[in-house]
Amino acid sequence: MDGSVGTGRQVGEIGAHVKGHNQNSVGICLVGGITASGKNHGEYTEAQWQSLYKLLQELEAEHPKALICGHRDLSPDLNGDGVITPKEWLKDCPCFDVWSWLDSEQVVNLDHLYKE
């Protein structure tokens, strides 16, 4: 959780992260963020936040028309009301609102900072 960035699949390779969206997306995985019992809590180290922010800037420069979002944001709108609510999420990750975080321009998300 030192913020190192590794490559699982190359950009252009089909991922296995969000059913129905794998062919046209790049998946990013943050290591950690879960409790010992396996519950998501979305807390990451300062180094991870900095690396994620930098990686997203690089990917956005390479793919300027791409939509940056979390797995949960690609869940179906089951009740058709135009809003994807927590009850409709197929996955919780990344356990924080990606759009709000990016709009805040706060590199380290203090609400989801792992405290040692």
Swiss-Prot record:
InterPro entries: Amidase/PGRP_sf (IPR036505), Amidase_domain (IPR002502), EF_Hand_1_Ca_BS (IPR018247). GO terms for biological process: peptidoglycan catabolic process. One of its GO terms (molecular function) is N-acetylmuramoyl-L-alanine amidase activity. Residues 2-73 form the N-acetylmuramoyl-L-alanine amidase domain. Transmembrane segments: none annotated. To phage T3 and T7 N-acetylmuramoyl-L-alanine amidases. This is Uncharacterized protein HI_1494. It comes from Haemophilus influenzae (strain ATCC 51907 / DSM 11121 / KW20 / Rd). The lineage of its organism: Bacteria, Pseudomonadati, Pseudomonadota, Gammaproteobacteria, Pasteurellales.
